Every structure is written in C-alpha cells, then in structure tokens.
Regions:
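Structure-specific DNA junction-binding interface
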Residues: 1-80, 87-98, 105-119, 123-198, ...
Length: 252
C-alpha cells in the first residue's frame, strides 16, 4: 500500500538550521555553544568562506552532523590528522572512522561536500571544447584527484571537435602504482566513438614528475590507440598543487 504523505509531517531543516532532535533525550544545547554557532554562521553569511580559517569552515560542516555537542575538538582532530580542509573532505571513509567518536553522520556530511565540489567542477568541462575550457579542466582534475591518498587513472574521451564526451575512471591502485591496460583503453575509445583521449592520473606524493613506468604506459597506450585511428592528445599527472602535461614537457 502506498503511504499517503500528510502536509502536517515535519519538513527537512534549512541548511542553516539545527538538525531536529528529541530535546527530551538530547538535552538543551549549552548557550555558549549556541552563541558560537550563531557567530560563525553570521560571519560566513557576511564574509563568505574567505573570512574563515579551515577549522571554522569545518565546524560549519560538522554542525548539522553533531547538533548537540561542541564540534571544535572534532574539527581540530580532523585537521591534525589530514592537514587541511581539502584533505579532510577527500579522506577515505575508513580513515575518517579512525578519529575517536566520529561516526557515519559526519562522514556523510563530508562526502556530500566532496561530491558537490566534484560535480560543480565537472559540469564546467563536460560537453565543452577542451582547448577553450583548459583551465576549467585542470581545476576539475585537481578537485577530483589532487588530494587522493592512492593513485587513480582517468580517461577523458573527446570527439572529432575535441569536445569532452565522457570522463571515466579506468582504475584505482596503491600509493605509487595503478594498473592500466592499453588494449582496454583503446577498446573503450571505440565503444564511445571517441576520436581522441587525454589520460589523467594523480601522484599521492604530490610530485607530478613522471616515473619511467608512467612514460612506458603512455607510449603503450599511444601505440594501441594509433592502430585504431585514435589520437592521444596528452597525459596529465596531477600533484598536490601543480600538474605536469606530457605534451608541454616534450614526452609526447
């Protein structure tokens, strides 16, 4: 039987509201915590994120997940463990659970922020000409990959007009290796009717300098694609704060 929704049912909380809780069981939020939260929210609304250090921005994210406690210790613990706001947001769930007292509610909030950032960056490059949107493409790659703790290999598929038609994760690996199979890359290009590719992978160490293995796999993929009439435009290695282009560096 389909449940009829009543207009008297409680609505979801607005983004700046507290998450509803049962006051009988949770108790009243101490005034000093409530005042602190109001001040942070007011400062965010007035000055935006630029007016706030990482630990305060992280507190704002944690407010909804931890509605009845002081979140400052959690924010500090997360930053002490991972270094900065970006690394906290992109940290793997198992490592986030290593923080004492931090549960799924917090992890979900953090991962929602990460997913939103990636979707916004991706929307700026999909179905766009890669040359005219090159900076946006680099921003997307950094948003999606720069703070990962393991290597990820992505392939950007382009049509004849160099418009990005697909962005796919090919493989995930360890901290310094990711398995890639040139024939599978070329096969997928044919399936998507792609005319060109851009390879992208990250270096968790933060240094985008290509290894010998990086150069070897690039040549192998280029050879596999050439037999099918598919062009390899570039291979980007994403570091923590910069990237390396095989094309610009003379490797292609």
């Amino acid at each position: 039987m389909v449940k009829e929704i009543s207009f008297s049912e409680p609505t979801l909380p607005f983004v700046l509201d507290e998450v509803p809780t049962n006051s009988a069981t949770s108790g009243k939020l101490p005034s000093y915590i409530a005042d602190h939260r109001r001040r942070l929210r007011a400062r965010f609304m007035t000055g935006g994120p630029a007016a706030m250090p990482d630990y305060e921005l992280l507190e704002l994210v944690l407010f909804r997940a931890i509605p009845r406690k002081d979140v400052k210790p959690f924010a500090r613990a997360l930053l002490d463990r991972f270094g900065d706001f970006n690394r906290v947001i992109s940290a793997p769930a198992p490592r986030l659970r290593d923080i004492p007292g931090l549960g799924d509610a917090v992890i979900i909030e953090l991962k929602i922020i990460e997913a939103a950032a990636q979707r916004m960056a991706r929307a700026k490059v999909m179905q766009r000409h890669v040359v005219s949107s090159w900076e946006a493409l680099l921003d997307y790659c950094h948003t999606a990959m720069a703070h990962r703790e393991t290597e990820q290999f992505r392939i950007l598929f382009l049509d004849r007009k160099n418009v990005l038609i697909a962005d796919e994760e090919q493989a995930q690996g360890t901290v310094d290796h990711v398995p890639v199979y040139p024939r599978e890359v070329a096969k997928r290009a044919l399936e998507l009717n792609a005319s060109a590719l851009i390879l992208v992978h990250n270096h968790p160490s933060g240094d985008p300098t290509p290894s010998q293995a990086d150069r070897d796999i690039t040549r192998q993929i280029q050879a596999a694609c050439e037999t099918l009439g598919v062009t390899l435009h570039d291979h980007l290695i994403i570091g923590k704060s910069e990237e390396l282009s095989f094309r610009s560096a003379g490797y292609l």
